[in-house]
Amino acid sequence: MKKISFLLLLAIVICSIGWTDGQFTDVRCSASSKCWPVCKKLFGTYKGKCKNSKCRCYS
């Protein structure tokens, strides 16, 4: 029973990581490299990805 509880808790923690650290922008993109200067300008970090043709920046 402890093993199942531990695995369930671990799964919840892993699934909840990263839900709030990404910030969407209205800037359209075709590749993640297009988002890097946008994220640097808006949020001061080069960490960004192109998701659903929009830049998403991470802190």
Curated annotation (Swiss-Prot):
The record marks K49 as: Basic residue of the functional dyad. GO terms for cellular component: extracellular region. The modification Pyrrolidone carboxylic acid is found at Q23. It comes from Olivierus martensii. The record marks Y58 as: Aromatic residue of the functional dyad. Its main location: secreted. Belongs to the short scorpion toxin superfamily. Potassium channel inhibitor family. Alpha-KTx 01 subfamily. Residues 1-22 form the signal peptide. This is Potassium channel toxin alpha-KTx 1.14.
